[in-house]
Amino acid sequence: MLGVIADIHGNAWAFEAVVADAYHRGVSEFVDLGDVLYGPLAPKKTFELLRQIKLVAQVQGNQDRLILKGPGTPTLDWVRCDLGEEPLSWLAALPSIATYGDCLLCHGTPYSDTTYLLEDVSAGFARVRSEHEIENLLGSTEAPRILCGHSHVQRMVRLTSGRTIVNPGSVGVPAYDDDAPVRHVMESFSPHADTRQLKAPQSLFITSSMTGTLQR
């Protein structure tokens, strides 16, 4: 069985829980849809955990790209320092799109890692795109199954053409707000796709978003 993961954002503890649950449910191999290591929690530990699973395909996300090429900020400087040379070289080698079987993997759309494939946020909230909009964003892509991330929202859309698009949501950051391309909020909810949402133990929470300090 194949597990689809996306948007871990350096949250190693959430990643551990998701992988454990996946193994319990019979998952034996994974594909990852990007934005793996960016975030002020535990990027190096996340990288080490990722190397322990059977990862059969992976793509680079927009914030993976930011780690490699973005301007210096306190968070980026800390992430780069925590990761070191090997994870950065590994990250740089990831493709922007990939295929696995009859699935096409991308972070945002097949042509942009910063565009939401299934949601329009021009009004400040997530509106599910029309089929016409989705088809336009897919362009010449012919894969019968498209796996995407970026929005952090679990969603599955079946097109009248017979194609299926699945966003598994985010392992590490299930909801967030952003100001690009406009100010908007992304919220998680129960999807129609066969996905999983896990609740963290109450005894474990983050007390510092910059250092990832844990309070037990």
What are these regions (language model features)?
Residues 1-9, 102-111, 165-169:
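Active-site-proximal beta-strand elements of phosphoester/diester hydrolases
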Residues 25-26, 85-156:
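His/acidic metal-ligating clusters that form di-metal
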Residues 21-22, 47-50, 75, 122-123, ...:
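Glycine-rich, phosphate-binding/catalytic loops in enzymes
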Residues 3-92:
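Core catalytic region of metal-dependent phosphoesterases/phosphodiesterases
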Residues 158-216:
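Acidic, His/Gly-rich catalytic cores of divalent-metal-dependent hydrolytic chemistry
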